[in-house]
Every structure is written in structure tokens, then in C-alpha cells.
């Protein structure tokens, strides 16, 4: 009976993805139906993980020729070093190699220096190449070396400064998170005849190094991994293997026809109209799928759950290789055992 704690809760049937204007960076993701209260619980947890716990890449320090500290200015460069650093913080990177790595910019004026002027190396890609870093006047020369690394969340400039940092190396605050903005909304929704469910909508914006769908998938995986320590029991057996000598890979009860169950006429007709013939067909259905059956409501659902519970079964079970090719022959063979 322990499985009832989670098996009888309704679960979302699919994740609907609505791409934004830039599908690689923006999307709205909708999950429904959820049990009442789960929209807020999951929405808040996923938002916090998305904003703080995903791996990304960022510039962690810069060294500019003839510059000793961040309050300096560079001859022929309109921006001062502080403004250049602020612009470097907004450079978006995709990094497929272990850091730290060194990149460089070498430019001559007159010119508008952008992220696209960063000399890329294998395994590192600049995503927002049009992003402006600074402006050079005629005759100006600019050479800078950038240190890039991977990490998560926010790391202060102080922590990004190496112990053996050379004179002129300026550490930069690093915001590693590839997710730039997340918001969520919870609205009531219906499933079949039941109105008391949640619909969770997440709007996710990324820097382009990861798609919103993948970002949400990674966040859910992190949450799943963190919660695993709290599960202190083994999963109960599914509707699989029973006796060694019956020749079956599943419980023979699954071969029993649903019209032999003591169900109300309404419930029986709903199953018939949905082409559910055997108990094996029935138990693989989820609550959400059942509630989408025409004229099938919560009363019928509870009736079926009670009948299945008395047989040691429940909705949402997994049966491998169902239905067997010779299902009618097997049903007749085991008919007397019912």
C-alpha cells in the first residue's frame, strides 16, 4: 500500500513548449495538470535552481596593455576601464572545455570593438558577437587578454583574483548562470470533470548557451538528485514477474477482462468506449489519461482505483511487452485461475 502515497497523485501528461521570438533563448513551458499546491511548490523550486545552480561560462579577469588598475583610462579609447569591465561582464560564452582559458582582443582604431573581435579558441564560442565592448579613436591601439572559466551562480571579483596575480590583472565579478530571467505563474485548470488542479507556466530566458527546455530539464534533474537522499525504501514491485512455473512474465490477473469486474454501468461503458479490454490495458493508464475519457469523472476513477487496489494493482503501472501476441489464447488458459 506504500505506493499509494505517490501512485494515486495525478501527474502532468506532457510539457508544452511555446518558443519565443528567439527559440534558442526564450520559451514558455507549461505543465498540467498538477495536484493542488504542486504548481507553487515546483515553480518556486525550479526557478531558484534555474537562477543559481546551472553551469555556465564567464570572463573572470582582464589584463589591458599599459593599464595598472580598473580606475585607469586608455589612450584613444572613449570608455574608461570601468565601463569596459561592465561591458565584458555581458559577453555570453559557450565553453565545452575545462577552464580557465585565455582569450585576447587586438584592435586598431578607428573601430567599434565588439565581442566578435575576441579571438576564439577550440571549445569556446562567443554567442553575442555584436555586443559592444568599447570604441577606438583614430590611431588607437588596444590589446587585452581575457581569462574565462566555468562555474555556477555568482562569484565575486575578490574570489576570482589568483594569489600570484601579476600587476595589471583586473579580476571581474562573474555571473556564470546561463539563465538570465525566470518567472512562473500558477493558474487553476481542469482535467476531465475535475477543476481542482494546477497549471504551471514557466517563462525562461537564457544567454543562448543552453535552450530553455534543456535548462529546465537540468534544473529538474538537480532537484531529483537532491531529493534522492530522502527516499529510504526500495520501490515496490511492478505488475511484472509472478510465479516461475506459470510461463508468464506478468501477473496472470492482467489477462482478466475489465467487463468481469464489478463496475458500475457508467464506468464499464467508459472503459469499453476507450477500447480498454483487459486489466493489463487498464493499469497502464494514468489518472490524467482516464479523466480525459469522455463522460469519465472522479467518481468512476475512485471506483476503479478501489477495485484495482483490492487486487494489489493500481493505475500508472508499467508492464513490459504488453499486450502479448497470443493474448486471447493466454486469457482462456488462465481463465479458471481468476
Curated annotation (Swiss-Prot):
Mitochondrion among keywords: no
EC number of this enzyme: 2.7.7.6
One Pfam match: RNA_pol_A_bac
Region of interest: Alpha C-terminal domain (alpha-CTD): 250-338
Entry GO MF terms: DNA binding; DNA-directed RNA polymerase activity; protein dimerization activity
Record keywords: DNA-directed RNA polymerase, Nucleotidyltransferase, Transcription, Transferase
Reactions catalysed: RNA(n) + a ribonucleoside 5'-triphosphate = RNA(n+1) + diphosphate
Region (Alpha N-terminal domain (alpha-NTD)): 1-234
GO biological process: DNA-templated transcription
Entry-linked SMART domains: RPOLD (SM00662)
EC top class named in words: transferase
InterPro entries linked to this entry: DNA-dir_RNA_pol_insert (IPR011262), DNA-dir_RNA_pol_RpoA/D/Rpb3 (IPR011263), DNA-dir_RpoA (IPR011773), RBP11-like (IPR036603), RNAP_asu_C (IPR011260), RNApol_insert_sf (IPR036643)
Gene Ontology CC annotation, any one: cytoplasm
Keyword Transmembrane helix belongs to the record: no
Oligomer status and interactors: Homodimer. The RNAP catalytic core consists of 2 alpha, 1 beta, 1 beta' and 1 omega subunit. When a sigma factor is associated with the core the holoenzyme is formed, which can initiate transcription.
Domain notes: The N-terminal domain is essential for RNAP assembly and basal transcription, whereas the C-terminal domain is involved in interaction with transcriptional regulators and with upstream promoter elements.
Role noted for this protein: DNA-dependent RNA polymerase catalyzes the transcription of DNA into RNA using the four ribonucleoside triphosphates as substrates.
Family in the record: Belongs to the RNA polymerase alpha chain family.
Protein name per UniProt: DNA-directed RNA polymerase subunit alpha
Organism: Ruegeria sp. (strain TM1040)
